Every structure is written in C-alpha cells, then in structure tokens.
Amino acid sequence: MTTLHRIASALALTACACHSATTSSSAPARRIPNGRPDLVEFPQNTLSDAERRDGWRLLFNGSSFNGWRGLGYDTVPTAHWKIENGTIRKIADGDVPRLPDGQPAAGGDLMTRDTFRDFELTWEWKISRAGNSGVKYNVSEEISMAGAPNHAALGFEYQMLDDSLHEDNKVPSHRAGALYDLIPPNASKTLKPVGEWNSSRIVFRGNHGEHWLNGSQVVEFDLGTPLMDSLLAKSKYRDIKDFATRRAGHIVLQDHVDEVYFRNIKIRIL
C-alpha cells in the first residue's frame, strides 16, 4: 500500500497557499481577540480574492440549498437536511419527524445539481459521537437510483467517521479519510476529536485521485492500474457496471444514520 500513500509535498504547499491570507473584499477578516494580533479569523462560506483568481466557487453559501437537491428528488428532503448557523446539518435519524403512520419522513443523500469532471473539492466537517457519514463523488444518479431505492448514492466515497467509537474503525478501509471499502488512510493521519472541525480535500483528475485530511495527504490512487482493478474486484462495488470507468458525476453528502455538519464547501475545475 506504500505507493498509494505517497505524500505529495508540492501539492501540500500549493493547497496551503490556495486557502491563505487574502480575503474577499465583501467579507473582511477580523482579528481574533485572544492576545495574538498576528492571528485573524476568516468568514465562513466565502471566497478570498486569491481563491476567486484561482477559479474556486462556493457549493454552499451558508444560507440556502441553491445548487443542491436530494438524489432522486427535485427538491431537498428537508426533514433530514437543515441549514443552521452557516452549516448544512444532517439530522440524526432519531430526530427526523414522523409521519401520521409513525414512519420517518422521507430522506436521502444530498446531491449537487451540477456534475463535475477533473476537480479539486474542499470542505470542513464535524461528526457526532460514534458518527458515520461521507462525501461521495463521480456519482451517477441513474446508476444510484437503479441500485439503491432508498435514494443512496453510488460513487467513490471519502469516509467521515468517529474512529474512536464507531464499529467501522475495525476495517482499515472504512476509517476516516479512506477511499471507502478500497484504500485505508495513511496511519499517520491527524483526525480532530468529535465536535471539532476537520478540513478535507479531494483531488480527482483523469485517472488520478487523492484524499487529504487536515493538511496531509492520506490516500492516493490511480484508476485502471492492476492494483486498483484488484481492489475494486474485492470491494462492494465489484458488480456495479461502469462504476470506475466514468470520469464525471455529482458531488453527494451522505444521508447516514448520524448527525454531521458541513461548511466551507468549495470546488474548482482543474
């Protein structure tokens, strides 16, 4: 697995530079009142001038679901998804409203209306205690709905997990940062505790993919190689036609059982 976990130092430096320093003129940075005049706090769900120049766009503006809908729906299943304090909140299943017959209101994954090819995606997330969720990409709605009547996306998944308590931590390729069910994250990763914000990044260009967690690359893969073909053949995706041959699809936030929050969701085409 060593070749899958190579740390790309140059990319790390570029990534840091891309999200630094210059703020949008419409939302200026402010000093953090902690006795450190050198530290500033940047507004959430905004783009800096540098990010705009580099081609970044917001997928979530902090106040609306513009650009999103439920997978298999024309609208957002708002019984399961809410906007709260500048975040997208996935409501825990136990808190979802009940219908008159006692069944929970319909839910499902939250999907971008647009599809993307050759992109870099960044976002921040925090998970609930023993929580499990994910961000899926290269998703075909048609394939997903044909194989998942519960409005669940089929695509490559960046796993988001409370590694300390969720039972999925027993499977290396199911831990936070993993390419779910395919490649485990680098063992040296840094995962923030429950209740704190993690920063994640996906790079997907041509046959090449990368997962980053809190500034460090934790997964690297190349589709079409004998190694990747072998991993796919042993995974949950092995019987899904064209799963790994498509190079464009939707970005999806997973509707799992647990509560999770998302913010600062940004993308740029490479």
Language model segments and positions:
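Hydrophobic h-region of N-terminal signal peptides that target proteins for export
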Residues: 11-20
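Bacterial N-terminal signal peptides that target proteins for export
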Residues: 1-8
